[in-house]
Amino acid sequence: MGKSENTPLLELRGVYKAYKVGGFLRKVKVNAIEDIWLSLGEADIISLVGESGCGKTTTGKVAVGLLKPDKGEVLYKGKNIWEMTKEEFKEFRRNVQMMHQDPYSSLNPMLTVYKTLSAPLFRHGLASDREEAVERIARLLRLVGLTPPEEYMEKYPHQLSGGERQRVAFARTLSLNPKLIVADEPVSMIDVSLRASILNLMLDMREKFKVSYVYITHDLITARYFSRKHLLMIMYLGSIVETGQTDRIIKEPLHPYTQVLLSALPEPDPRITRSKKLIALRSLDVPSLLRMPTGCKFHPRCPFFKKGLCDVKRPTLIEVESGRRVACHLYGS
Amino acid sequence: MRPILSIKGLSVEYLSPRGRVKAVRNVNLEVYKGEILFLVGESGAGKSTLGLTLLKLLPEGIAKVVGGEVIYHRDDGGNLNILKLRKGRLRRFRWKEVAMVFQGAMNSLNPIMKIKDQMYDVIKDHGVRLSKREAYKKIEELLAMVRLDAKRVLKSYPHQLSGGMKQRVMIAMSLLLDPKLLILDEPTTALDVLTQKNIMNVLKDIRDKLHLTMIFITHDLSLAAELADRIAIMYAGSIVEVGSVEQIFYRPKHPYTHGLLKSVPKLTSEIGKLESIPGFPPDMINLPPGCKFHPRCVFRRDICMEKEPFLQKVEENHYTACWRWRDIFGEE
């Protein structure tokens, strides 16, 4: 058990991660994420939202221990995962699972559903023979809505639709009874009519087993649905720009980037979407990570840009009201 | 309203090792001059295949039109049967009458040619009688229309432009020979929200300024909500419902459309738990008998499992392919 009641399940403390890019003559270090803070407890949900290249996937990989941060700490139940013993790290990896975007490439095409799902069970000693494995897998398949399970067990990925594959992938994620699932765009390649069912399934598992989620997406609308009363974190070019309760941010976005994003988002309702007023950007171009803007990273595009301040000083994330943090000079900092 | 395109009883099949994939099945649809028609459907619904067929761009040897025709109505009153066009005429037809922009089209720009030369080549290669100066004037006008800085873009190579800029170059390029109809297949799908919004606005400008007819193919109902005049919903290769944007969004008359609308989350309005459509899309090789949606439909009766419904008139401009729409949704 954790050290105390209040020890979060997972914590990221001031995490930095840089990649080396460029040719063999001139390698440049690019900060993929900078100073990321995140904390979540049992049955908590946090949605990480941002456009491509904002560092949300890197943050996810750091959180599950697939990437080692250059600076900062990743704590699981209060313990730095990079200072764990082999045994502890193995337990951490079993309890914190990653779910990927592409159900077409995340399943081995040569393996039946049974083979895919039984391998981790045997590896982690959760089943000792075929009979036990079949029983457990049948329960998992029923849980994710693939019935009759006996029929699905013998199928290969190519015999399944995208929605079915994502359910198999989800069953695999669940097979080791994880405490936390980092789901990276789990529904973006799934058909619209099946998305809701996958998201609902994930939410059901939270109800049933108190699973926590880090939901990574570019799609604010599904993020809103998934983490309404929970947390939302908006990222831009590797930094957190705004964080707080999802519904409150959607209702009243504080950071100019969040405001622009919400104003640009099309919605599946003609009257609503056609009456939206777009907040115009100063520039449409996303700056290159190789030439990160000085001061606030959003300043070259920000409609509220103040010369001499925003292009000089990087805003820090400050708490503007209880539970809401924003990194913008409009709100002090 | 005058149609610019009439699709009559069109069916297309792909040959696969497992059997014939019935990608498009008996599609009947008129596209009216000056409208923005959205073809909305999920993967495998046949919307992209339908789009390709309209330009006779189906991969030869693999795909086959097994029935029906596509008639293009020219401004001068003449009619063209697109599927019967031969190479030379087809080539001219493709840029001058109908043009197409694909998802990821920006990747089809030649990486070692400046935008300027690629755009000029389109004009030159199609034998348009314009002086070099007139041609560049036209190119600059179109780049301005898609909100690009012509001076900068023209002398750039594709790698110097962002994805959104390249996609706008492709849109400008598709307009070079003044087509009357533009087909857009998921033109914004791989792009970020802000870039996507910009392209949607560009398309609005084009509609307002050039009065072009557009067919926009997408899986994204939000984009249809934003730009469509009319929407055709596709399922398992057929059009299951067609109507105005208002009719489809606020008074749907097909259980699939209805289910689809209830399964997408919204941002501003209050919502409870989303309901998704039960089951999975059908296998396009072994389609179920009767209505292709019946295995997933909560309203099905015996007739739905026996006979495939055809499009029936609900009200002016609004058609649904459901035997039971009156019982389920009531009359307007």
Outline where the language-model segments fall.
Chain A
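Charged, flexible cofactor/metal-binding loops and thiol motifs
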Residues: P8, Q245-S333
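ABC transporter nucleotide-binding domains
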Residues: M1-E252, S263, V326, Y331-S333
